[in-house]
Amino acid sequence: MLYLIVLIVTNTDGTFSYYTYDFRSFATALVAFDRKQAEITWDTSRAYYTIKLMDSTGTILKAEERDLTEIRGTVSD
């Protein structure tokens, strides 16, 4: 099964950036933007993902864990 996550970031200048990730089972992605970074951990065996928003020093500003079923969708070929 293919899981795709799209992270959309609003930059301080009002522009948008987006990042896409294809996670087959378990992975962690680190994205840096506007002197902040986001760490996304995707674990399909537990059916959860975790997002941590950190400042440039690595201090966690916000963290949340959610059920994959909240965002799961179907895409056909």
Where would I find each of the regions flagged by the language model?
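Intrinsic disorder/low-complexity detector
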Residues: 13-15, 24, 57, 69
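Hydrophobic beta-strand residues in large extracellular and virion-surface proteins
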Residues: 4-7, 23, 29, 33, ...
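Short aromatic-glycine-(Arg/Gly/Cys) micro-motifs in beta-strand/loop hairpins
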Residues: 1-19
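Short, mixed-charge low-complexity intrinsically disordered segments
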Residues: 39-77
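Eukaryotic scaffold repeat domains enriched in small/polar residues
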Residues: 19-20, 63
